[in-house]
């Protein structure tokens, strides 16, 4: 990776395609460097792991219920038949307030299924301010491609 990465080409590709698949060096550093460049360009950014994401669209944009771990305790007579359900706010709710562009970087995106990746692309097309970068694995140097191109192959 070059010593100085301006991120201009990355930002142009991100704005053109909306959802990118990234292969980053395993030693790290590329994601924070590019996120810093995006923040400098006016984006509001968030970095998350894709593990445990569930339904991406509901998790990111809608109020939804979660079931906390039971930790060996029984919940007889409390809550629903499926156990206690807690309501949580959408994870991108505070970022989508206002007019600023939003960039979401998902780590460990290789655990997501094809349909989940496709729903992330659809979410980017429905919400014009949202840009999603999914880290799909490691590589010796930083490279990226449109998510639609990855799903087509």
UniProtKB/Swiss-Prot annotation:
It is an enzyme of class 7 (translocase). Keywords: Membrane, NAD, NADP, Plastoquinone, Quinone, Thylakoid, Translocase, Transport. InterPro entries: NAD(P)H-quinone_OxRdtase_su_N (IPR020874). Its EC number is 7.1.1.-. NDH-1 shuttles electrons from an unknown electron donor, via FMN and iron-sulfur (Fe-S) centers, to quinones in the respiratory and/or the photosynthetic chain. The immediate electron acceptor for the enzyme in this species is believed to be plastoquinone. Couples the redox reaction to proton translocation, and thus conserves the redox energy in a proton gradient. Cyanobacterial NDH-1 also plays a role in inorganic carbon-concentration. This is NAD(P)H-quinone oxidoreductase subunit N. Pfam families: NdhN. It catalyses: a plastoquinone + NADH + (n+1) H(+)(in) = a plastoquinol + NAD(+) + n H(+)(out); a plastoquinone + NADPH + (n+1) H(+)(in) = a plastoquinol + NADP(+) + n H(+)(out). Belongs to the complex I NdhN subunit family. NDH-1 can be composed of about 15 different subunits; different subcomplexes with different compositions have been identified which probably have different functions. Its main location: membrane. GO terms for molecular function: oxidoreductase activity, acting on NAD(P)H, quinone or similar compound as acceptor; quinone binding. It is found in: Cellular thylakoid membrane. One of its GO terms (cellular component) is plasma membrane-derived thylakoid membrane. It comes from Parasynechococcus marenigrum (strain WH8102). It is a peripheral membrane protein.
């Amino acid at each position: 990776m070059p010593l100085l990465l301006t991120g201009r080409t990355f930002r142009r590709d991100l704005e053109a395609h909306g959802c990118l698949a990234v292969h980053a060096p395993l030693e790290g550093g590329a994601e924070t460097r590019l996120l810093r460049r995006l923040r400098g360009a006016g984006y509001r950014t968030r970095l998350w792991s894709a593990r445990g994401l569930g339904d991406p669209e509901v998790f990111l944009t809608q109020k939804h219920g979660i079931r906390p771990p039971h930790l060996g305790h029984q919940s007889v007579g409390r809550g629903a038949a499926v156990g206690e359900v807690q309501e949580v706010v959408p994870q991108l709710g505070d970022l989508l307030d206002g007019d600023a562009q939003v960039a979401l970087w998902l780590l460990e995106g290789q655990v997501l299924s094809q349909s989940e990746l496709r729903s992330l692309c659809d979410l980017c097309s429905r919400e014009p301010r949202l840009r999603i970068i999914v880290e799909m694995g490691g590589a010796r140097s930083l490279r990226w491609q449109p998510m639609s191109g990855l799903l087509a192959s």
